[in-house]
Amino acid sequence: MLGIGAFKQRMPRPGEALPGREQALPLHNTHLVNGHPLRGEFIGLAQVQFGLGCFWGAERKFWNVPGVYTTAVGYAGGQTPNATYSEVCSGQTGHTEAVLVVFDEQAVSFAQLLRTFWESHDPTQGMQQGNDVGTQYRSAIYCTTQAQYDAALASRDAYQQQLTAAGYGAITTEIRFPAPTFYYAEDDHQQYLAKHPNGYCGLGGTGVSCPIGLDA
């Protein structure tokens, strides 16, 4: 039998992933910071999922961006439906810790969100982010439109040039379209750093400026 450590640096193969559950985890559907719903149809608004390490600090990066309507943390990109935090931390779900960002495209451009994403973490670290090691900390952009996907790929290529010039390696960010199912995390994790202002935040960027979204 494989131990949990076996899944820290590799994704579970078919048959290795935990089964999960049919029912979604309970969710208090109100954003603690802005009062908007966490779950809904969000008609007239755009959505994207970002993974950039521990989702506590990642979510705060985006709820502070003007034009973002709401944010929520959850699990995405893996195989286990409605996984729990402990299951995701085992590495046996294939999920990354993700932030759902719902935004008004008339108030904030996707390019600006991409710039926040790239500059808020080190996208060259593979299955970890800083001291947080495991597949659930991998960098990811899960797009909901073809236009987002094309823009994400172009931004990756532009940022790679800047990172290479600064001595960094290859970007390992997973970029996908269409976006996989987003499974909302437990209530305790939603807007965690608003509930615990001095709580853990392991995010750290490279210090390399991303050359997109400056004039958007």
Swiss-Prot record:
Protein EC: 1.8.4.11
Active site: C54
Catalytic activity: L-methionyl-[protein] + [thioredoxin]-disulfide + H2O = L-methionyl-(S)-S-oxide-[protein] + [thioredoxin]-dithiol; [thioredoxin]-disulfide + L-methionine + H2O = L-methionine (S)-S-oxide + [thioredoxin]-dithiol
GO biological process per UniProt: cellular response to oxidative stress; protein modification process
Highest taxon above the source species: Bacteria
One GO location term (cellular component): cytoplasm
Pfam families: PMSR
Top-level EC class: oxidoreductase
An MF annotation (GO) of this entry: peptide-methionine (S)-S-oxide reductase activity
Keywords in alphabetical order: Oxidoreductase
NCBIfam families tied to this protein: msrA
Family classification: Belongs to the MsrA Met sulfoxide reductase family.
Function statement: Has an important function as a repair enzyme for proteins that have been inactivated by oxidation. Catalyzes the reversible oxidation-reduction of methionine sulfoxide in proteins to methionine.
Stated name of the protein: Peptide methionine sulfoxide reductase MsrA
Underlying gene: msrA
